[in-house]
Amino acid sequence: MGRPLTEVKYLLINSAPVILGYALQNSLQTSSVIVTGRLGPSELSVAAFAYMFAMSTGWLIALGGTTAFDTLGSNLWGAGKKQELGILLQTGFIVLSILYLPICLVWWYSKPILIFLHQTPELAEASQKFLRYLIPGGLGYVCFELLKKFLQTQEITRAGSYILLVTSPLNVALNFLLVHYYGLGLKGAPLATGLSYWLSFILLTQYAKYVKGAEAWNGWNKRCLENFGPFVKLSLLGIVMVGTEWWAFEIVALVAGKLGAVPLAAQSVIMTTDQLLNTIPFGLGIITSNRVAYYLGAGLPDNASLTAKVAAIVGVAVGSVIMITMIAVRNIYGRIFTNDPDVIQLVALVMPLVAAFQISDSLNGTMGGALRGTGRQKVGAIVNITAYYLFALPLGIYLAFHGKGLVGLWIGQVIALSIVGILELKIVMATDWISQSRKAISRFGDSSELTALLN
């Protein structure tokens, strides 16, 4: 039992600061929306909608594209190729900056896209202006996330949280200064938040340089321009893997808006809650991915297999705790957000459905992490597309407009996450770990090194 307990301890201890970090990262936007909301309800709507659009597009480059580093970076670290990790970081900066360029165009010309999505011309116009001011800061978000992955790969999991504990309150102050004190209004919010992202990145570089993490950096190297292929491929597949789930939830939000004011308000409460809770399986998934990829790169397939199994058990346990808690507070939870009795009642009605998929969502997080650790982002993307877009979304939308309303939409989401969780669990448990270790080592090592490690 010693080895499994060691893995349980490792996952829990190292995922905790990662989860905290993502919660703080989300708070940068949340606090910006709250500060902007003091201008009025229309400004609140614009800020909330623009950040939602940013999350569904630009932030996918950061949170989906950097999954390539989870795989390749941890393989290198496991194989003891520390200096190669710094070169991979340089490759990541170049690749993700290039991938961010189309996002800049989408944000700059977002008005027709938003009108196509049936948003009002006024909201589309104001959101486009907001997003244009967010473009410079968005690259800071991408760079910060990539540098965090560079440190997490070296098992330095707390650095990002330390930095965000500093920049989160500064972000509130910056938003207040630019939005209200200097009178920039809606323009001030994206500028302030963008400054916070760049400040977070700069402070994290100083942490890596002067505190911990510099041993894997040996200066800029022209080799970072070589062999873009694996990083580009895994980045794009990671974006699709993460994006297909996020887009499905955004589609649910758009459909909920057509069901009326009360369902839309209840959906806003539920989505805000789910986004916060999702940081838990997402954080567990990152540590699982790093651990699995590390063992595969080190030629320890049995350890990688054990980590995946332990991660599945931890995911089920964590999901169960969240599920029980949500069911217990369902009748009073809506009061945190509103005094409207109809909204509170609808939140209480839908909460058991949201609670029902917490175990599946936790499995999705941990098993998705295991898949990324083996470099199989493509498999995760296919599973997500099949579950959400071929089954769950069509069913949920049909039920929503045939008497079930918001409950129908969330029935679809429960089915989707159940399919994803079960399929990914089966795929990971059926993995040929020796074969995956061979692939991991062969990405960066020669055949003699491969034979020596696996023997």
From Swiss-Prot:
One Pfam match: MatE
Example GO BP: xenobiotic detoxification by transmembrane export across the plasma membrane
A single cellular component GO annotation: Golgi apparatus
Coiled coil: none
Compartments, as annotated in UniProt: Membrane
InterPro entries, sorted: MATE_euk, MATE_fam
GO molecular function, one term: xenobiotic transmembrane transporter activity
Transmembrane segments: 4-24, 44-64, 87-107, 159-179, 184-204, 236-256, 280-300, 309-329, 343-363, 381-401, 405-425
Keyword Magnesium listed: no
Keywords, comma-separated and alphabetical: Membrane, Transmembrane, Transmembrane helix, Transport
Membrane topology: Multi-pass membrane protein
Family per record: Belongs to the multi antimicrobial extrusion (MATE) (TC 2.A.66.1) family.
NCBIfam families, per database record: matE (TIGR00797)
Protein name: Uncharacterized transporter C11D3.06
Taxonomic lineage: Eukaryota, Fungi, Dikarya, Ascomycota, Taphrinomycotina
